[in-house]
């Protein structure tokens, strides 16, 4: 059974070389053979880029499963801490200000590295930030947005199955002219900052059309009371209505460098969402590593 599911597919635990890995299955059921061939070609091209992308703040892509006609499989490193969203949702989780600053910097560093490699994310949120055993953040679910054939298919499926909530992370310009730039991901980063300090769901209870109306009218989420002034200033600049007024990820990293600890001074417990068990998922049958097989 999958231990996580999202708009792009279900995620299973598997084994590669004796190590636990994640296998994300992107369903190809119902996709015509010719279209599947085009999607596979696009997938392989981007896979090479993603495998070469190595950074402490991004999830490592290890390979791909291409032999099963019912799905495309993306093999990635397994992180035991689960998603940042999961940690924020836990009522028993005491999150210190030190960790909060640490996470804001980790996500910015991961995103800055993606853009240094000319890779857009397009779906940045705390669901797509994973935690290591010691509470470090790594950005995941990047890169596939560049696969045009695959993007068209998964976007259609996502809109059909789970459109609710998506606008909460989308920059206002995407509702107007649909022009995506780095600054669009920066807007999403601002919402991640809000999530880290509020621990709530952005625009909870509102329908997509209501969120859209607020964004176009330049309304934003209320600044969390616990948020330090320097970070609330950064957040408000990062979700500015005008994309040109938002900082780049490189600029954000420079700004955060002086106020972020190198690592948390103490770790009260291992960060673990759940304990993996043998049999959650079989080892991938064919893995090609490095090859293309509110404020009113």
Model-inferred region functions:
Residues 185:
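Conserved catalytic-loop aspartate of Hanks-type protein kinases
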Residues 103-104:
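Activation segment signature within eukaryotic-like protein kinase domains
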Residues 43, 47-48:
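Regulatory alphaC helix of protein kinase catalytic domains
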Residues 115-131:
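Catalytic-loop of the protein kinase fold
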Residues 68-77, 85:
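A conserved loop-to-beta-strand element in the N-lobe of protein kinase catalytic cores
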Residues 10-30:
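Glycine-rich ATP phosphate-binding loop
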Residues 63-65:
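A short, aromatic-enriched beta-strand patch in the conserved N-lobe beta-sheet
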């Amino acid at each position: 059974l999958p231990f996580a599911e999202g708009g792009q597919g279900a995620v299973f635990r598997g084994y590669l070389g004796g190590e636990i890995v994640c296998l994300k299955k992107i369903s190809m059921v119902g996709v015509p053979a010719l279209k599947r061939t085009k999607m596979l070609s696009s997938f392989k091209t981007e896979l090479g880029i993603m495998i070469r992308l190595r950074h402490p703040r991004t999830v490592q892509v290890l390979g791909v499963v291409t032999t099963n006609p019912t799905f495309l499989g993306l093999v990635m490193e397994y992180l035991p801490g689960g998603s940042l969203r999961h940690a924020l949702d836990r009522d028993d989780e005491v999150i210190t200000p030190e960790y909060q600053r640490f996470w804001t910097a980790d996500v910015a560093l991961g995103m800055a590295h993606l853009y240094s490699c000319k890779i857009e994310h397009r779906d940045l949120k705390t669901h797509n930030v994973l935690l290591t055993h010691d509470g470090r953040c790594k950005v995941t679910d990047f890169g596939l947005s560049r696969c045009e054939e695959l993007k068209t298919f998964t976007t259609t499926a996502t809109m059909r199955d789970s459109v609710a909530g998506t606008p909460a992370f989308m920059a206002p310009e995407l509702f107007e002219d649909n022009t995506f730039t780095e600054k669009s991901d920066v807007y999403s980063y601002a919402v991640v900052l809000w999530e880290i300090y509020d621990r709530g769901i952005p625009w909870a209870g509102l329908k997509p059309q209501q969120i859209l109306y607020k964004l176009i009218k330049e309304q934003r989420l209320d600044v969390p009371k616990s948020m330090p002034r320097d970070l609330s200033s950064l957040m408000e600049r990062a979700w500015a209505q005008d994309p040109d007024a938002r900082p780049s990820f490189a600029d954000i990293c420079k700004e955060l460098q002086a106020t972020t600890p190198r690592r948390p001074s103490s770790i009260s417990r291992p960060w673990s969402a759940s304990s993996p068990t043998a049999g959650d998922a079989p080892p991938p049958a064919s893995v090609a590593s490095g090859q293309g097989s509110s404020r009113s």
